[in-house]
Amino acid sequence: MAGHSKWANIKRQKAVVDAKKGKTFTQLSRAIILAARSGVPDPSGNFQLRTAIDKAKAAGIPNDNIERAIAKGAGTFGGDNASLEEIRYEGYGPGGVAILIEALTDNRNRTAADLRVAFSKNGGNLGETGCVSWMFDQKGVCVVSGVVDEDQLLEASLEGGAESYEMTEDETAEVFTEVANLEILNQTLKDQGFKVTDAELRWIPSNHLEVTEPDQARSLLKLIDTLEGLDDVQNVTSNFEMSENLMAVSFA
């Protein structure tokens, strides 16, 4: 998972930069709208909304924008947000790498067309529903920073119902659990004094496809970057494994 985790770290850093440019404001705002619409529009009683707000704040989105998105989701602001729907798309990248795309859109035809263009221009192809999703399992993931004692992390993770954890970089770990247990794990880790910087649902590949060829690596990372740059796209997950050196050279 080292290569894939490195890519996750790059994406988190990139999201902050992109948000400051205004690129991800739409994506994060839509996530808040959907969360507020799906449950109570109060973050204290809606874990999905609370985590969406935390991500927006971490990316530097102003409180006024966040409050406006909550109001839109609650139906108290105006505008047609009922048409927003969650859709999962699937496809193949260069070399047969499996790719899952989670989108939030008010026009599925537009989204599918944008995705198809992105795939075709970068050596991949958009597939049918179910073509690659069987290669992934959805899990809850807590990203924990400032981990200086792995034994304490293990004890707290087990207490919170975690299945496993992985150290991804210096003093940072990802703790995995069942989807329904994410909120409990998140709270348990915080109660034990750990700093949880992110809590999210993530698709985890059951097997990884090793990428070693530089041209394939460049095309693949360009494809993923292009997909993530689309306003309707919320998350992109793939099953590639790549050395950090190759990733750094290809992503530069």
Curated annotation (Swiss-Prot):
Membrane-spanning segments: none
GO terms (BP aspect): regulation of DNA-templated transcription
Coiled-coil portions: none
HAMAP family: Transcrip_reg_TACO1
Intracellular or extracellular location(s): Cytoplasm
UniProt keyword annotations, A-Z: Cytoplasm, DNA-binding, Transcription, Transcription regulation
Sample GO molecular function, one term: DNA binding
Protein name, as recorded: Probable transcriptional regulatory protein all4276
